Amino acid sequence: MATREVGFIMTEEYKAWIDDIKNRIRQSQIKASVRINYELLDLYWELGRDIVNKQQNAEWGDSFIAMMSKDLQKTFPGMSGFSQQNLRSIRYWYQFYHNCSNDLQAVSKLKTIENMVKSIPWGHNQRIMYKCKSIDEALFYVQKTMDNNWSRSV
């Protein structure tokens, strides 16, 4: 049954159309969130690589992470993710998968791994990398998280 709104008759067709628009908006929001997450993790991957390289090549040791954290937090005060602990986690995350690439004997496999781990949220990545003993075990949980939309509590 149609209802009237100031010169407009609301039909079932209109309601279905609005429902479709709402669903498309929600899907766009989800896609945007996934893309934002991927870009953030892409940044984290690059930061991890840079931290590892600076520690090896510039011989800065571990203490520069505290200064790096202060500098980034000062420049981006409202942005989380640049604490000393998180920067250390970012470094560990990069090393965990990068160091294990020798066992996989393929650069293309590392790129596949990189794309996989960037497809799940940072909190999930942290939980997986700290709990798993091997890259195979970690990738199992990354894949299951992607396939089943697992939360961190699983």
Descriptions of predicted regions:
Residues 1-154:
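Basic, low-complexity intrinsically disordered segments
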